[in-house]
Structure formats: structure tokens, C-alpha cells
Regions:
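Surface-exposed, interaction-prone regions used to assemble/regulate multi-protein complexes
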Residues: 2-231
Length: 231
């Protein structure tokens, strides 16, 4: 009997990236409720869960025996900045739109990198450089630890196609260092603080504002509200 791990049982929320949708049995509503019920235990990381880091590219990683640390360019803030530049006709170099957030997962077990085949089977591989954060699942929570599965994208050289990998870890503590506010100030100064605070207010709620279209709508909404208030 094979003792291979399978994505369908390890992290079914991530399975659609690897297997046919018809094979997946997962109650998303129940999972969302699970996240809400464990909000205090998840701490600051909780507000970013369920796809809010999707497409955030990896700035840096650090792995040792008791830590997995990754710094991302927060895609949601990046997209909102892009929307502000478009709406307000600003001349800002796109390469400057870097909004770092550092995720430190303290752990006392091995962090594993895994390939996933067409049947969902996981095969552990050597750690590799990650390029883009795609998704995550909180697999289990108790008083001592939180078990996670993450999907990342890796781009290869020499015309080799990119590939998705699954990273598994068990965290005893999570430390989040948000540096987006400082980056925003360096790029925009204080001219668009009201827009930025409005964006963060809705980002911190259950409202989805993590794509370009939604961010453009949010800016229009703020302008309309401001006009009504000043009338």
C-alpha cells in the first residue's frame, strides 16, 4: 500500500490547481467558518487568508531548522497603487510599486517542498527558490501549533515551463511584519492617504478588493462619497 501523501486529503482547498475538479470534495463555506472561529489564534495573518496574497511575488526567503521566513510584495496593495496611478494620471515608475510584508513561521519540524502529479500525489523535493505566492490552506489548529499548506509558483530558465509546488509546514508561532504603510508613504507621500486608508478599511473587512477592477471601483466609490459629503 502506498504511503504517499495526496493533495486531496492533505490540502483539498489547494487541489484544483493539480487535479480534476470533479475529484475534489471540500466545503468552502465550512472552511471560511473555521477561519472565522479561529481568528484570534491566527492573529494578524488571519486577515490575509483565503487568496488575499494571491499573485504576490516573493522578494526573499530564509529557511533554517526552526524558521521559515518569506517576504512578499503584497499584491493587493500593489494593485491598489496601480489603480491610484491610473485614476489620478500619476507619473510613477511601476518598478517602484513594492509593498513588503514579512511572514515568519517559527517551527520545530521540517518544512517540506513537494511536487504534485496529475493524480494529486505529493513527492518531496529539495528546497528551491520560490517566485510567486498563489494560495494557502490552514489544515489544522490546536493550542500548540498551526498546520499550513501553501502553493507557490516557480519560473524556470531555458524555456522550461513554470511549475506549481506545495510547501507544508507546522508553525508554533507566526510573526507578521507589515511594511506596506512605510512603502506607500515613500512612493506617494501623504497626498493619497485618504484613499489608502479607505482601501485598507475595506481590505480588512470581508470585502474582496484585491484586483484592478475592484480597486478602480473603490476609488470611484470614495470620490463619490467625498463629493456627497462636501455638497
Amino acid at each position: 500500500m502506498s504511503n504517499k501523501k495526496n493533495i486531496l486529503t492533505v490540502a483539498p482547498f489547494l487541489a484544483e490547481d493539480f487535479v480534476e475538479a470533479s475529484e475534489i470534495v471540500f466545503d468552502v463555506d465550512q472552511y471560511q467558518q473555521f477561519i472565522r472561529e479561529n481568528k484570534q489564534r491566527l492573529g494578524l495573518f488571519g486577515k490575509y487568508l483565503i487568496c488575499k496574497f494571491h499573485d504576490s511575488w516573493v522578494i526573499d526567503t530564509n529557511i533554517n531548522d526552526n524558521l521559515f521566513s518569506i517576504t512578499l510584495n503584497d499584491f493587493s496593495t500593489h494593485v491598489f497603487a496601480d489603480a491610484i496611478i491610473e485614476k489620478k494620471n500619476l507619473n510613477v515608475n511601476h518598478d517602484k510599486l513594492v509593498f513588503p510584508i514579512q511572514l515568519d513561521f517559527k517551527t520545530n519540524t521540517k518544512v517540506t517542498f513537494n511536487e504534485v502529479d496529475d493524480y494529486g500525489n505529493l513527492t518531496e523535493i529539495e528546497p528551491l527558490k520560490l517566485d510567486e505566492y498563489l494560495n494557502e490552506q490552514v489544515v489544522s489548529i490546536d493550542n500548540d501549533k498551526i498546520e499550513f499548506a501553501f502553493t507557490f509558483w516557480k519560473t524556470f530558465q531555458d524555456d522550461k515551463p513554470g511549475q506549481k509546488f506545495v510547501l507544508l509546514l507546522i508553525a508554533t508561532e507566526i510573526i507578521i511584519s507589515e511594511r506596506q504603510d512605510l512603502a506607500w508613504q515613500k512612493i506617494f507621500g501623504s497626498d493619497f492617504d485618504n484613499y489608502y486608508h479607505y482601501f485598507k478599511q475595506h481590505f480588512d473587512s470581508d470585502r474582496y478588493v484585491s484586483d484592478q477592477h475592484k480597486c478602480l471601483e473603490l476609488i470611484d466609490e470614495y470620490d463619490t462619497t467625498k463629493s456627497s459629503t462636501n455638497a
